[in-house]
């Protein structure tokens, strides 16, 4: 089944389906007509326009006042892509690069960018054949768009750069020859249309949101298992509490916990303690705040991936070519920083629950193991979780609060959204690991509540998990078990 590139709203849920099912892309007639119309308008306009047009007949950045002769316009765009491919550092995950291709294709399809049809089609060919450009994590200021990473993404279009194909990094020129593909000869404005845009930031945000929704759900399931293992109380999850402070995420979290724990023998037994620590009692408020943030950020990013974000913007129907600032990443940089904080907090409260489970309280043995002293048990997994959480807290410093002028002061305010994007991915990875460690601890602790049973739902998760990770009788090599726990929730 193919996904048709059109002007219909592209949702993150559908992007998840495109990626998970390996769908191919096909350019719809509406999008094709818009691309052709805009390119034709631009070509006609260039024949009789009497003024410089930024990035079309001029240099770039602070070189915007230098007019380029008509015979050099194609070379100008070629030079732009080559010269701006200055990324460095670690390479971007292949799945995020593939998202970059999808989102760039979508943005160009609206017909406000002035690109050739053949250019968009080649991007589609690369997506459909899993030919993924090698892109680097460092180099973008998040305005004028994601110049360096998008340059690396687009180098293969002109037969340059490297691509990942069938698990092997290849020179694009060699692969193009094997496939009998000709490099695209860029026309006026095309290089700028390809490089100006927020697709590096947006792709990271989309990938992170998909993971965030998964991790938020796991945080509830694992938190519910921990609550059972700690012999916690259900009263803080009663609906009456949350109806008088009606944040949607809080209400949803409390309802989810009531559902997860329905029928539990452990939750129904008489409790000796009057109340639970905040890391259990305030789960609806904390997990709920993260849910609300995820929901908000998702709405912002969905707006972004359905937008034209290059510059200048071409309006054929209005006979306008306008140099403006849709490439600026601030509208998504701030939400990405928010999402980083929301995910970090899921890990933060998770680590506190881990700590409580190993503390020798409420009938649980010290460090959840027999013969403590001879055995260290689950002592060090908590250290690992604490280390990860501390790193994530450091990464919560908002990248979007910073700006460094560039291009001789012409580009004097930037979003640093690309830095927000890459550290967001790191916090996603960190949160996944902390939740996996909590599951490792919670499952161990739950065994000490036997013969009482938890709810059907929690017991089902527990039984499935036990197929991968066993109960720990005595000290053993923990690292493989933590990795299996990560894989389990992935």
Question: Which residues are covered by each model-predicted region?
Answer:
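Generic N-terminal targeting/processing segments that precede catalytic cores or assembly contacts
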Residues: 7-99, 118, 125, 209, ...
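FAD-binding core of FAD-dependent oxidoreductases
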Residues: 54-68, 72-76, 83-108, 136-158, ...
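Alpha/propeptide regions of enzymes that mature by internal proteolysis
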Residues: 91, 111-116, 217, 306
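Conserved, non-catalytic sequence blocks in retroelement Pol enzymes and Pol-derived host proteins
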Residues: 112, 141-143, 373
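FAD-binding glycine-rich core of flavoenzymes that anchor FAD
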Residues: 112-138
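Cysteine-centered functional microenvironments
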Residues: 135-140, 317-321
């Amino acid at each position: 089944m193919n996904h048709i590139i059109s002007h219909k709203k592209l949702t993150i849920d559908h992007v998840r389906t495109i990626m998970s099912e390996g769908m191919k892309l096909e350019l719809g007639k509406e999008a094709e007509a818009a691309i052709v119309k805009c390119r034709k308008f631009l070509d006609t306009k260039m024949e009789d326009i009497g003024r410089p047009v930024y990035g079309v007949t001029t240099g770039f950045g602070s070189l915007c006042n230098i007019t380029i002769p008509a015979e050099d316009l194609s070379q100008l765009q070629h030079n732009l892509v080559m010269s701006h491919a200055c990324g460095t550092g670690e390479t971007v995950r292949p799945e995020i690069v593939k998202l970059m291709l999808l989102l760039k294709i979508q943005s160009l399809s609206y017909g406000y960018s002035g690109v050739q049809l053949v250019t968009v089609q080649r991007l589609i060919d690369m997506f459909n054949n899993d030919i993924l450009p090698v892109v680097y994590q460092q180099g973008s200021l998040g305005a004028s768009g994601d110049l360096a990473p998008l340059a690396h993404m687009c180098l293969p279009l002109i037969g340059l750069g490297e691509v990942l194909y069938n698990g092997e990094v290849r020179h694009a020129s060699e692969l193009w020859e094997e496939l009998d593909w000709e490099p695209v000869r860029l026309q006026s404005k095309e290089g700028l249309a390809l490089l100006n845009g927020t697709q590096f930031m947006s792709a990271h945000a989309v990938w992170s949101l998909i993971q965030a929704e998964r991790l938020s759900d796991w945080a509830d399931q694992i938190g519910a298992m921990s609550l059972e293992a700690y012999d916690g109380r259900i009263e803080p999850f009663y609906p009456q509490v949350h109806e008088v402070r009606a944040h949607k995420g809080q209400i949803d979290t409390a309802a989810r916990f009531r559902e997860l724990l329905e029928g539990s023998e452990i939750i129904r037994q008489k409790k000796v303690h009057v109340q639970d620590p905040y890391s259990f009692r305030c789960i609806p408020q904390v997990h709920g705040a993260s849910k609300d943030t995820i929901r908000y950020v998702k709405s912002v990013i969905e707006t972004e991936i359905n937008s034209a974000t290059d510059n200048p913007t071409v309006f054929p129907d209005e006979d306008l070519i306008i140099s403006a600032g849709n490439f600026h990443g601030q509208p998504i940089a701030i939400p990405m920083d928010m999402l980083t904080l929301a995910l970090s907090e899921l890990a933060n409260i998770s680590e506190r629950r881990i700590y409580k489970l190993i503390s020798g309280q409420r009938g649980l043995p010290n460090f959840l193991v027999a013969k403590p002293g001879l055995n260290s048990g689950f002592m060090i997994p908590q250290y690992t979780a604490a280390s990860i959480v501390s790193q994530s807290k450091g990464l919560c410093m908002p990248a979007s609060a910073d700006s460094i002028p560039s291009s001789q002061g012409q580009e004097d305010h930037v979003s640093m959204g690309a830095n927000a994007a890459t550290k967001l991915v790191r916090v996603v990875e960190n949160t996944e690991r902390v939740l996996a460690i909590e599951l490792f601890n919670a499952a161990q602790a739950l065994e000490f509540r036997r013969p009482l049973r938890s709810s059907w739902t929690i017991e089902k998760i527990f039984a499935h998990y036990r197929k991968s990770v066993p109960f720990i009788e005595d000290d053993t090599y923990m690292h493989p078990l933590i990795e299996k726990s990560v894989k389990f929730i992935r």
